[in-house]
């Protein structure tokens, strides 16, 4: 166990410069070297060879740097994990809805929602369209045409039934 800065634990087996640069946001190689030089330590110093007094010096210097007052803010890993988690949630929702994950939804959503079928079983597609709500323009057109045809067919059947009733009464 090396230096513990807030929630950040620096690896004791690696050089402090590399660990500062890797784990604390806002610290690059030059800043890490300056911090260690200001504390009066050697640049190639490893975490397991540090004394408590040297750790305190490094902590004080880090706190004095502008923009690094709150050194717990500098957790790169946690910050990136939060962002990735939110991105993944957003992407997951978009994938479920059938929308493109990023980009234009006015026209791209139509392409994203199309079902690629080899060969083209149109009858199966039409049956699928009738079972669920249409999701894009093409499906809506087909859905509306089929509905109109069904309505016409139903009207004709009703007319035929009425005419048969009249015929039987005569």
Curated annotation (Swiss-Prot):
Region described as Disordered: spans on this chain: 130-170
Main location per the UniProt record: mitochondrion
Subcellular location: Mitochondrion
Molecular function terms, GO-annotated: rRNA binding
InterPro entries linked to this entry: Ribosomal_uS13-like_H2TH (IPR010979)
Gene Ontology CC annotation, any one: ribonucleoprotein complex
Alphabetically ordered keywords of this record: Mitochondrion, Ribonucleoprotein, Ribosomal protein, RNA-binding, rRNA-binding
Biased composition (Basic residues): 132-147, 155-170
Subunit structure: Part of the small ribosomal subunit.
Function of the molecule: Located at the top of the head of the small subunit, it contacts several helices of the small subunit rRNA.
Similarity remark: Belongs to the universal ribosomal protein uS13 family.
Name of this chain's protein: Small ribosomal subunit protein uS13m
Protein species of origin: Dictyostelium citrinum (Slime mold)
Gene it is expressed from: mrps13
């Amino acid at each position: 166990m090396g230096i513990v800065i807030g929630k950040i634990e620096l690896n004791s087996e690696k050089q402090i410069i590399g660990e500062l640069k890797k784990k604390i946001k806002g610290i690059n190689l030059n800043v890490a070297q300056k911090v260690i030089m200001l504390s009066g330590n050697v640049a190639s110093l490893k975490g397991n060879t540090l004394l408590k007094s040297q750790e305190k010096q490094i902590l004080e210097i880090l706190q004095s740097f502008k923009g690094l007052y709150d050194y717990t803010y500098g957790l790169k890993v946690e910050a990136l994990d939060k962002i990735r988690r939110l991105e993944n949630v957003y992407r997951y929702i978009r994938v479920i809805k059938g929308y493109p994950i990023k980009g234009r939804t006015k026209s791209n959503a139509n392409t994203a929602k199309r079902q690629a079928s080899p060969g083209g079983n149109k009858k199966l597609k039409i049956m699928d369209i009738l079972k669920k709500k249409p999701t894009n323009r093409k499906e809506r057109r087909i859905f509306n045409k089929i509905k109109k045809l069904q309505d016409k067919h139903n009207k004709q059947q009703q007319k035929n039934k009425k005419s048969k009733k009249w015929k039987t009464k005569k």
